[in-house]
Amino acid sequence: MDVKEIMNPKYWMVGIGSLMLLMSVFGVMDGEQMAVDMWGADNVAEHDAEYEEMWALNMMSLFAMFVFIGVLAKGKTLAQLTMAASASSLVFLVVGMMVLTGDSEYDSSSLIIIIGGASALLGISGFLNKDGD
């Protein structure tokens, strides 16, 4: 089994999309606990649970698209969409989280590393298969 087979964009899109979709469902179901986990128990206001639930709901649509792309697209189109998903995830989620949450005591460093790493692997899988093999 070579690297190209392991880095199949279909599996990466469906796998990452499904995992993050599941995590988003938990965020919608228990926004209060998500807020406590992210902001700290002594730093959670009444409205923070709703913010976390809406953030998770918003992310559900993004990660559902990852799954749909992985299932429906093929060949070169799948590789291109995988690279585009990787780039947009890196820019908006990783850079956005670093810039927007840096001063607010929101500890997102581990989340940034996980999302950044997964996004980078997603981009590599698309690049390795860019010829549509």
Predicted regions and their residues:
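Membrane-helix boundary connector in multi-pass membrane proteins
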Residues: 92-112, 128-131
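Aromatic-anchored segments of alpha-helical transmembrane domains
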Residues: 20-25, 87-98
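Membrane-water interface at the C-terminal end of transmembrane alpha helices
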Residues: 118-133
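Hydrophobic alpha-helical transmembrane segments of polytopic
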Residues: 9-19, 55-58, 84-88, 111, ...
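Short juxtamembrane and helix-loop transition motifs at transmembrane-helix boundaries
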Residues: 40-50, 70-80, 98-102
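Juxtamembrane helix-break-helix junctions at the cytosolic face
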Residues: 9, 65-87
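Cytosolic juxtamembrane helix and N-cap/initiation of the first transmembrane helix
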Residues: 1-23, 46-47, 132
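Hydrophobic transmembrane helix segments
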Residues: 18-58
